[in-house]
Amino acid sequence: MARHSGTSEGPKKRGRTELRSIRRPNRSQHSKHDQQVVHESENEDSLESSSDDDEDIAQAEAENSDRKEKVYGALLTILNSEHPERKKHKSHSTDFVKEIDEQEEIEQGMASESEEEDEENDEEESNEGDEEEEEEPTDQLDTFESHFNDVSQDLVDDISAGFKDKQIKYKSMKYSLDKKESAIFGKPLLLTQQDETIDNPVLTSSYDSYFIKQRLKIQNDLLDSSKENLTPLKKKLLDPMFQYKDVLCEYTNYENDEKEYRELYSLHVLNHIYKTRDKILKDNQRLQENDDLECLDQGFTRPKVLIVVPTRDTAYQVVETIIEKSGLDQIDKKGKFKDQFFDDSLPPTSKPKSFRHVFKGNTNDFFVLGMKFTRKAIKLYSNFYQSDIIICSPLGIQMILENTDKKKRQDDFLSSIEVMIVDQLHSIEYQNISHVYTILEHINKIPQQQREADFSRIRMWYINDQAKFLRQTMLFTRYISPTANAIINGKCHNMAGRWKNNQIISSEDSSIGQLGIKIKQIFQRFDLVGGTVVDESDYRFKYFTSVVMQNIVKSTGYEDGILVYIPEYTDYMRLRNYMKEKTTILFSEINEYSTQKQLDSNRSMFQQGRTKVLLYTERLHHYRRYELKGIKSVIFYKPPTNPEFYNEVIRFTAKNAFLGKSDINISTIRTVYSKLDGLALQRIVGSKRAAILCHGQNESYDFK
């Protein structure tokens, strides 16, 4: 029997802590995933196509996450952040956060709508006939009208039936954005239409080509097209975004890029809300003149935009950007909002820059906030059913959608969402990605209760349960992952098609190119001979235990100081149990569920050489960014999704060598991978090298 230090059996807590944990099902028990679409991408290189299998794995895993154990009783526990090394918040802010009842705050958003309805009706009556006229662009139809109002119901019926009967195939085209980036546009077509060519996407890179409300043009200085000064990121996103296509955007800079795409989508959603509202008011006036007119201009409920973000700090930035772009000065409950969402505390400067960015400010991940727009004001904390925009964390909205108290469970307010945005998807993946899938399961469903809606004005594609084929979904992430691809490919069925960018990473810009350390790096590939993509985890485990484990036992490098880095928690538990039951290796283990005592004790024993191997999870590294000591060699059970983690972990060995405790010429870095790891490998070794690693004849490649 193996001897190991620490007994980290995983979490036994319930409530929010459990819901923050990541569970993945045993792939041997994998159930069939809804493979409604056959994906095709013309002119894509072999590496891009090889990542499709990885997308299927991620999609199957996320959809089968087991949520039966969620318990509501401990909801109000654990308000603290999952990374205690951050600087403490200011005392007044901490006291306030401890006092508020977050669950009650969310439930207030589901309260009776009657008071706001009366106020809203009064306001609409006083403002009818006060709509603005936009200047019509000469080179483009109004995409709001063409996508939502003028779309052929027969076409919607055909697409809907095609997805249902699995008769849809995406036809794609690829085009270059610049030397380091390309874009792929795909559109769903019936199998009977596959001989047709899809039109080239309209690329104008100009606000002037779209119907933007006059008040927004004035506020954002867009009246003169010569003053647009669009950044490269805004230029490539403007057209697919304002054409209501689905978007999967991988950006490169935490600070500037996030600010830029938020400015763009804030303008887009404001324009969408204003146009929706003004159309209803115009139709109200038309119906007063002729009540026999058919005016289909509404959904079941008012909310039209859902923005999903990881933390309150991100929510604060999003709301502030929307307020700035709107130009409205009257903001109801802004003081309360700042008290509950803003925090100027920062993580320690010793942490990496990316960590300080992700975990700055208020990192609380439990909230849902409604935003209601009137002619002269923005009302924060509005009732969800009377809101135009809902901003939430995955955990916060999960507690409404799948509340264990069935009387409090609701999803009707998501029935008429027309634009959904997931901001910082890469951070949300480290929380609990299954909550995003939960949202996608509940969005655009026909309401269970009859709301205050005029059914004579509800669009037919809402009544026919076809809203998901018109909904625009936009995902913004620092790194495109198999999960991100699975969401955009498997859960988004927008008739307008989908757009995503692809970074072309040179060897110089890769992790290895930026490492700055000469150390032996070995990449070992295992193949899925006769297996399917859902068997990949089993093949990896078998390869690791039969091949890589022998190197640990034989100690070809050092007798101790071996770090095994494991991205997936389920893989970590499987390997941990194997080493405990089937080997005699002395090992320590630390993961995201370890107590502080276990973390300190096991790290200390490993550093002192009392244990040979340290098992270390990626999620723990994401939340803590430990400076691990005593590392002489590293084994990556799977390539890290975040390429920064690859270099950070390797530098542990360099620091150990610098202290004279090891020889870097003897140290080795070993990475186990399959062809399904192409996305992660591109960022680590570069796009061209990754293609060779995935499809070359050799099974092992060395770098130094």
From Swiss-Prot:
GO cellular component, one term: nucleolus
Keyword field: Nucleus, Ribonucleoprotein, Ribosome biogenesis, rRNA processing
BP GO terms, sorted: maturation of SSU-rRNA from tricistronic rRNA transcript (SSU-rRNA, 5.8S rRNA, LSU-rRNA)
Localization per Swiss-Prot or TrEMBL: Nucleus, Nucleolus
Coiled-coil regions, chain positions: none
Pfam families recorded: Utp25_C, UTP25_NTPase-like
MF term (GO), any: rRNA binding
Major localisation: nucleus
Acidic residues compositional bias, start-end: 42-58, 101-139
Chain residue ranges for the region called Disordered: 1-140
Biased composition (Basic and acidic residues): 10-21, 31-41
Domain of life: Eukaryota
Subunit structure: Component of the ribosomal small subunit (SSU) processome composed of at least 40 protein subunits and snoRNA U3.
Sequence similarity: Belongs to the UTP25 family.
Function: DEAD-box RNA helicase-like protein required for pre-18S rRNA processing, specifically at sites A0, A1, and A2.
Protein name: U3 small nucleolar RNA-associated protein 25
Organism: Vanderwaltozyma polyspora (strain ATCC 22028 / DSM 70294 / BCRC 21397 / CBS 2163 / NBRC 10782 / NRRL Y-8283 / UCD 57-17) (Kluyveromyces polysporus)
